[in-house]
């Protein structure tokens, strides 16, 4: 099997895993509600919380983080197996992670209308380089707590993780790939938050704890 075909298969695996809309599934199964008809219409944990089900929101957050991490870990395992068999293998881990992030934002099952990718990118960050995951989580929580804006927390976390990757100890080639893919995910994440950014600038963004 060619390297190109392997990369396509890894990307497809990551995308399909990332495209599973856990927020929508959980809200429908246990909350009897279509989360797309609630609040912002997003399928992520923040909007699931607006249904009044903190338990489902927590599960959504867990699974959205988990699918990003799992995509990276599966690709890492495959790369290691390939190395054991052939003596060489490309680093496909972050390709799978970026694909999972893309799948969450643009899931094929929902007409390519998905979430904003914060939790999934957090999972990718933890699995790709745990330091980036810690930086992401701390920056997300602190900025959300200080500003009381969930959107601000997610955007600051993604930017902080990308900056941290610039100091990642790795070969030049791997380092450049990580910087490029983390930067790409952050740019897309900010684009997915463009509505939030407009509301922040106009003073109309909902704060954490505000009634919907």
Curated annotation (Swiss-Prot):
Any matching Pfam family: G3P_acyltransf
Keyword line: Cell inner membrane, Cell membrane, Lipid biosynthesis, Lipid metabolism, Membrane, Phospholipid biosynthesis, Phospholipid metabolism, Transferase, Transmembrane, Transmembrane helix
Domain of life: Bacteria
UniProt GO molecular function: acyl-phosphate glycerol-3-phosphate acyltransferase activity
Record-level GO BP terms: phospholipid biosynthetic process
EC number: 2.3.1.275
Pathway the protein contributes to: Lipid metabolism; phospholipid metabolism
Entry-linked InterPro entries: G3P_acylTferase_PlsY
Location (main, coarse): membrane
Location in the cell: Cell inner membrane
UniProt entry tagged with the keyword Transcription regulation: no
Membrane listed as a keyword: yes
Membrane topology reported for the UniProt record: Multi-pass membrane protein
Catalytic activity from the UniProt record: an acyl phosphate + sn-glycerol 3-phosphate = a 1-acyl-sn-glycero-3-phosphate + phosphate
Record-annotated membrane-spanning stretches: 6-26, 56-76, 92-112, 122-142, 150-170, 171-191
One cellular component term from this protein's GO annotations in UniProt: plasma membrane
Quaternary structure and partners: Probably interacts with PlsX.
Function: Catalyzes the transfer of an acyl group from acyl-phosphate (acyl-PO(4)) to glycerol-3-phosphate (G3P) to form lysophosphatidic acid (LPA). This enzyme utilizes acyl-phosphate as fatty acyl donor, but not acyl-CoA or acyl-ACP.
Family membership: Belongs to the PlsY family.
Protein's name according to its UniProt entry: Glycerol-3-phosphate acyltransferase
Organism: Zymomonas mobilis subsp. mobilis (strain ATCC 31821 / ZM4 / CP4)
């Amino acid at each position: 099997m060619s390297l190109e075909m392997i990369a396509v298969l890894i990307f497809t695996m990551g995308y399909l895993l990332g495209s599973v809309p856990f927020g929508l599934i959980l809200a429908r199964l246990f909350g009897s509600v279509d989360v797309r008809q609630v609040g912002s219409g997003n399928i992520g944990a923040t909007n699931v919380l607006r249904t009044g089900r903190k338990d489902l929101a927590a599960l959504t957050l867990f699974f959205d983080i988990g699918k990003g991490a799992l995509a990276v870990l599966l690709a890492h395992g495959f790369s290691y197996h390939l190395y054991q068999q052939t003596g060489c293998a490309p680093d496909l881990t972050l390709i799978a992670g970026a694909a999972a992030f893309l799948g969450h934002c643009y899931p094929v099952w929902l007409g390519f209308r998905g979430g904003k990718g914060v939790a999934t990118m957090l999972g990718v960050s933890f699995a790709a380089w745990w330091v980036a995951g810690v930086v992401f989580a701390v920056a997300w929580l602190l900025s959300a707590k200080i500003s009381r804006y969930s959107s601000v927390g997610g955007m600051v976390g993604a930017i902080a993780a990308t900056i941290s990757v610039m100091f990642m100890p790795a070969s030049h080639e791997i380092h450049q790939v990580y910087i490029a893919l983390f930067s790409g995910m952050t740019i897309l994440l900010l684009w997915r938050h463009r509505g939030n950014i407009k509301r922040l600038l106009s003073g109309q963004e909902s704060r954490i704890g505000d009634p919907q």
